[in-house]
């Protein structure tokens, strides 16, 4: 039987290390959440993208998400709201509806008005912390900078990593780049909102919040 050379052993060691690192990265990118009980309520919170501007109320992503996951989904979208305003409003909605799960999609109006990205990041982080401090599980929807064909800022992923929560970095960016899924330059149409709802439901399943 031929002897295994030091070079081969070294290569095997590198391959093993690479495999381990990939597994660790995979685990890090897939946060785990507690399964939602049947009576659990979901709060979708944000601005006009959550409200459903550009489509009928029953075609908004919260309405479509409710049909997909068989949980009550409260639409907490307020058109025109900045992240600073959302931070002030969130506590009221958490107190009133007592959700077990929060889908947070905020920052669009900060970007449209060229407000501070650092302040938007601070506000989104504060909203996530507020929910987590109350025992509410959270998922982030990353918002791209409209009209610039640029991906969402890195702070969404950084906040998700800090709090070990899921984040969808692609769905809204993908919808906005496809004119067939848009009602105007900023808001999706019914098809676009439907795709958002499906992506969110799948992400909730992947995290363990929903049964597959």
Q: Model regions: which residues?
A:
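Bacterial N-terminal signal peptides that target proteins for export
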Residues: 2-15
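C-terminal motif of bacterial Sec signal peptides marking the signal peptidase cleavage site
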Residues: 23-26
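Serine-esterase "nucleophile elbow" of acetyl-processing enzymes
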Residues: 28-82, 89-98
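Acidic-and-aromatic substrate-binding clefts and catalytic sites of carbohydrate-active enzymes
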Residues: 52-56, 81-84, 114-115, 146-149
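Alpha-helical cap/lid subdomain in secreted, periplasmic
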Residues: 68, 88-212
């Amino acid at each position: 039987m031929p002897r295994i050379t030091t070079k081969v052993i070294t290569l095997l060691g590198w391959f093993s290390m690479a495999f381990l690192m990939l597994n660790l990265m995979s685990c890090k990118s897939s946060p785990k959440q507690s399964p939602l009980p049947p009576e659990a309520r979901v709060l979708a919170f944000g601005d006009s993208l959550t409200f459903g501007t550009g489509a009928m109320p029953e075609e908004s992503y919260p309405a479509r998400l409710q049909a997909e996951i068989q949980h009550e989904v409260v639409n907490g979208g307020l058109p025109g709201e900045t992240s600073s305003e959302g931070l002030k409003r969130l506590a009221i909605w958490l107190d009133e509806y007592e959700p077990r799960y929060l889908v947070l999609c905020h920052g669009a109006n900060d970007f449209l008005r060229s407000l501070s990205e650092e302040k938007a990041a601070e506000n989104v982080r504060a909203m996530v912390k507020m929910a987590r401090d109350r025992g509410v599980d959270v998922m982030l929807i990353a918002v791209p900078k409209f009209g610039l064909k640029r991906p969402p800022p890195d702070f969404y992923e950084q906040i998700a990593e800090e709090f070990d929560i899921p984040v969808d970095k692609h769905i809204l960016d993908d919808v906005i780049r496809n004119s067939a899924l848009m009602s105007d330059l900023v808001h999706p149409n019914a098809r676009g909102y439907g795709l958002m709802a499906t992506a969110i439901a799948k992400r909730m399943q992947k995290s363990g919040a929903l049964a597959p």
